[in-house]
Amino acid sequence: MIRLQTYAAFSLMATATAVYYAFSSREQFYPAMVYLSTSKICFVLLLNTGLVAMCVAWQLVKRLFLGTLREAEVERLNEQAWREVVEILFAVTIFRQDFSVSFLAMVAALLLVKALHWLAQKRVEYIETTPSVPMLSHARIVSFMLFLLVVDCLFLSNSLRSLIHKREASVAIFFSFEYMILATSTVSTFVKYIFYVSDMLMEGQWEKKAVYTFYLELISDLVHLSLYMLFFIAIFLNYGVPLHLIRELYETFRNFRIRIADYVRYRKITSNMNERFPDATADELNASDATCIICREEMTTAKKLLCGHLFHVHCLRSWLERQHTCPTCRAPILPPDNGRTAARPHGVHPGVQPVPGNGTPGSERAAGENISRRQAKLEAAASAASLYGRSFAYPPANNLNRYSTPPQSTSNGPQSGEASTSNQSPKGHATADPSAPTFYARGAVSSVTTTRELESSLQKAYENAIKSQIEMLQIQLQMFQHGATSSATNNENGEHTKSD
């Protein structure tokens, strides 16, 4: 601000000197004005003074409605300013036929008005995340947004009148479009602020706030996308490819597509929340921390995710509007593909279904724990097998020794007879250990014989790998021994040479 004051003072002094010289040398008003408008030095000084006046007015508006800017607001202002200047330069190349002093003044005014809009959006975000905001700040931000809306409407009406008066494509299309975008952004920011105030008056208990905010942003992106497309077509038909609109058009389309995808995913997840996420029992609430980490309040009733964490149903619904992962462990919450997906245990892949009757309580307790590296390899192999139509999956490596040799039974006592009898199926086939994981893929059950063949082949592969490692170690040992013998021989020869 001090540098602006100094620059403004020097600019005002230079302009006053030029005006005094023009009137003192010409002595009449009309010749003096002709001299000021035709002299290049005087013309540049007058333009500079006009720009300084606009900057001073911008500083006064900012100080009146916002006060001192925060560091985040200054950073946002600097980042957006450079991008906007580059886009304005591209726009100037498109409308070079309409280039004039008034066009430069309108462009400078547009940049300053856009900067005020960026600050307003950032200040509203700051107010929404601040616990206690004084009433003066609320009054200033409301009056500031109303002031911006009035300015947008005035510039928009001026551009539309110019466009209607000329009845042809001109630079007025550019300013009409820009101020229309700014006006819709101001309305969206103001409505979002109203949502915040309503939630604050309800002491943070307005459950529909996130839903309404999401719909507001969706409608705002749709309106902006429609305006960008219309303006792109209008400029393309009359002037050529508008390079300054390509980035904005792409970003708006990407944001709109992401919001549509989030909305569809949210509807899929919340359409059957009662069936997909069961209610937590009293024992589960007592066994775990009964505090919802979303709202930090005690839970009397809660929903249980597949990962085992508990949340309020309304907190979970509001969380799913923005995120699709567990708030605690960040495990993904995917929408159900069919009715059976909701009942699938955690950690089992869609193409791999567990055998009925083999589920144990230990598997439920281990659902929230981190899986080991070998189990991750097993799940990856099972998924690959299901994708390629295989009917088998490799068991964990810690079960290979258990299945590498068939169970042996003796007739030394009755217990041995019972064990041998219990290890046979009704058809006379030996069954595997109940703790061993059995997999289904595409409805086909892998037999015990196939499992044993896979186990034996994998065991042989391990044995071959170990043998090759042993051979390499033996070769390295021999080379080391040979090197040690050679060094000892060289040392002895050196000692004999010294003694001789």
Curated annotation (Swiss-Prot):
Catalytic activity annotation: S-ubiquitinyl-[E2 ubiquitin-conjugating enzyme]-L-cysteine + [acceptor protein]-L-lysine = [E2 ubiquitin-conjugating enzyme]-L-cysteine + N(6)-ubiquitinyl-[acceptor protein]-L-lysine
Q: Where in the cell is it found?
A: Endoplasmic reticulum membrane
Supply the PROSITE patterns for this chain: ZF_RING_2
Region Disordered: what ranges? 337-375, 398-438
Transmembrane stretches in the record are: 4-24, 41-61, 99-119, 136-156, 171-191, 226-246
Which terms are listed as keywords in the entry?
Endoplasmic reticulum, Membrane, Metal-binding, Transferase, Transmembrane, Transmembrane helix, Ubl conjugation pathway, Zinc, Zinc-finger
Q: Which pathway does it take part in?
A: Protein modification; protein ubiquitination
> To which protein family does this belong?
Belongs to the HRD1 family.
Q: What is this protein called?
A: ERAD-associated E3 ubiquitin-protein ligase HRD1
* Gene name in the database record: HRD1
